[in-house]
């Protein structure tokens, strides 16, 4: 309740000052009128001199009345304004405390709702995991049975098909067999270049054998005759009786016995000569050529082979465990900033001398711009972004102690704007097109005021010039440097912060950073994730050729607000693109 007490005291003090001023002024007027009537009573006595005194007293009284009345009225208004300021300050703090309390209460409620929703989600996920873990063995066993039956049927069908292929190929090979047989028979009966063939060779062989037999036949007859006649002749001589003289008879048998081979040889020669004379025409080696017979034509049926069927065993991977992620609620961040007052306050106190020694105060106004910022952030996911560098707010005060007490206070607030820009890797932002009136600047350089003072008799002239520049410009930072660090960004999001102090924003960078802006070497790390594992260790080397053409991000439009709420919009265009290509090799191994 102290602020109410101060308000009452200030109010009554102002009223008292006004009443005192009015009373004093009325009293002064009454005294002046009384003095005027006294002067008028003595008019007849001091008429010439009092006329001049009368006209001199009235202007002085009026000037004193006006000065005193104006001073008291101004002091009273200042005290009333001070009282209103004192009462509004606690109200402002009270409203701020109330707003903070309401926001904190809503924050707690929202965090509890998120925690409850996360608990329900995690419970459902856990239940699904348990169900999957329970049915997983049954599904895997059923899968294995289906795979075994499929492979068994596949092998049986493959064997049946192989037997059918063998039998079919046997019958399909018969045309080839008959073709080969006909070619062989044709080769037996062909007569290339008067060479002997089967049709001429057999008669020639028969004729040769007949001629050879006919030539040897007399010798055979002679030999057989000798072998047949000699024993019979010896036997006949030996068994013949002896006639006459026994000695002569014995001697005659002995001579005949001794000459029996000669007689047999003569007889065989006679037989041979007789046979040669009878079979002379058959002893020849001449053969008669016979004409070739027509060739056997081979069949023209096509020969077809059935291809063997290639089969491959089929295997089904086991059902893997369900991979889920627990949902962890993130506490929301609430920031309620106090109203920010931005403006220029100029106060000139000029003392002007008067004939009565009084002073007159001339006070020029205060330009006030007020903005209230409420920032409410509910963070569920982390967004990869990068921000502009914040420029610290600038507050400059200029003062100079002079005889006339001229004081100037300049408050300049620099607005902080951060922008998350989506940058595609391998984009060279070499050209930035700014609209007219937008340039690079250094907000730390503030304009200096210019002052001039001139004095003369009973007057002081003071001239003060302050250049307050509200200029929209882009502060220099890494994006406009010689090199550009390319990185991944997800969502283009505009962050506006208006504050008297520098706000610290953590710069979260996620992505692939290249040391050189334009480079022919593309280095990347690829992580290949497997959702299905195999019980058999396998390894393989895969070579993949990768190429991509990045596209520059679309033009971004920014809207800024100066302290007097005038929107200034301009567009930054990023022009240029680069194409990269290369080979990416990696080794895949599972176990």
From Swiss-Prot:
Gene name tied to this protein: SIFV0056
Region (Disordered): 282-319
Keywords associated with the record: Signal
The keyword Signal is annotated on this UniProt entry: yes
Comp. bias intervals (Low complexity): 282-295, 303-319
The protein, known as: Uncharacterized protein 56
Signal peptide: 1-24
């Amino acid at each position: 309740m102290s602020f109410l007490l101060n308000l009452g005291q200030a109010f009554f003090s102002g009223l008292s000052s006004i009443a005192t001023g009015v009373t004093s002024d009325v009293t002064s007027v009454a005294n002046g009128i009384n003095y005027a009537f006294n002067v008028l009573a003595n008019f007849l006595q001091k008429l010439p001199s009092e006329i001049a005194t009368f006209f001199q007293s009235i202007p002085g009284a009026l000037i004193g009345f006006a000065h005193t009345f104006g001073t008291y009225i101004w002091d009273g208004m200042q005290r009333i304004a001070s009282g209103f300021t004192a009462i509004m300050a606690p109200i402002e703090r009270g409203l701020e405390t109330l707003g903070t309390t309401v926001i904190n209460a809503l924050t707690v409620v929202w965090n509890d709702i998120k925690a409850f929703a996360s608990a329900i989600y995690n419970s459902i996920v856990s239940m699904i995991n348990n169900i999957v873990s329970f049915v997983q063995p049954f599904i895997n066993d059923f899968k294995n049975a289906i795979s075994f039956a499929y492979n068994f049927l596949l092998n049986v069908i493959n064997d049946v098909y192989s037997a059918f292929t063998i039998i079919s190929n046997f019958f399909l090979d018969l045309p080839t067999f008959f073709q080969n047989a006909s070619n062989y028979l044709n080769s037996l009966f062909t007569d290339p270049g008067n060479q002997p063939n089967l049709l001429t060779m057999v008669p020639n062989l028969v004729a040769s054998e007949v001629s050879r037999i006919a030539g040897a036949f007399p010798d055979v007859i002679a030999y057989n005759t000798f072998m047949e006649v000699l024993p019979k002749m010896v036997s006949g001589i030996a068994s013949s009786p002896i006639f006459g003289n026994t000695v002569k008879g014995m001697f005659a048998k002995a001579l005949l016995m001794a000459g029996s081979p000669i007689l047999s040889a003569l007889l065989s020669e006679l037989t041979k000569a007789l046979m040669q004379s009878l079979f002379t025409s058959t002893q020849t080696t001449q053969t008669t050529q016979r004409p070739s017979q027509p060739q056997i034509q081979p069949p023209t049926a096509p020969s077809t082979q059935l291809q063997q069927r290639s089969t491959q065993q089929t295997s089904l991977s086991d059902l893997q465990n369900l991979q889920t992620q627990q949902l962890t609620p993130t506490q929301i961040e609430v920031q309620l900033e106090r109203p920010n007052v931005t403006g220029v306050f100029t106060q000139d106190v000029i003392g002007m001398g008067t004939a009565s020694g009084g002073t007159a105060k001339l006070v020029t106004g205060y330009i006030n711009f007020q903005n209230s910022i409420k920032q409410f952030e509910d963070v569920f996911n982390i967004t990869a972004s990068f921000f502009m560098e914040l420029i610290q707010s600038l507050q400059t005060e200029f003062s100079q102690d002079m005889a006339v007490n001229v004081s100037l206070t300049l408050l300049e607030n620099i607005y902080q704007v951060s922008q998350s820009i989506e940058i595609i890797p391998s984009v060279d932002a070499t050209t930035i097109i700014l609209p007219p009136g937008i340039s690079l600047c250094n907000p730390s350089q503030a304009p200096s005021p210019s002052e001039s003072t001139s004095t003369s008799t009973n007057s002081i002239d003071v001239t003060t010039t302050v250049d307050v520049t509200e200029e929209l410009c882009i502060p220099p930072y890494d994006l406009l440097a010689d090199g550009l660090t390319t990185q991944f960004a997800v969502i283009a999001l505009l962050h506006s912060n208006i504050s008297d102090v520098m706000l610290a924003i953590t710069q979260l960078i996620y992505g692939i950073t290249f040391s050189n802006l334009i480079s022919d070497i593309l280095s990347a790390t690829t992580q290949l994730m497997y959702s299905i594992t195999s019980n058999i260790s396998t390894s393989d080397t895969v070579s993949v050729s990768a190429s991509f053409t990045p596209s520059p991000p679309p033009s971004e439009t920014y809207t800024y607000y100066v302290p007097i709420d005038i929107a200034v919009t301009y567009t930054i265009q990023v022009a240029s693109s680069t194409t990269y290509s290369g080979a990416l090799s990696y080794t895949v191994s599972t176990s």
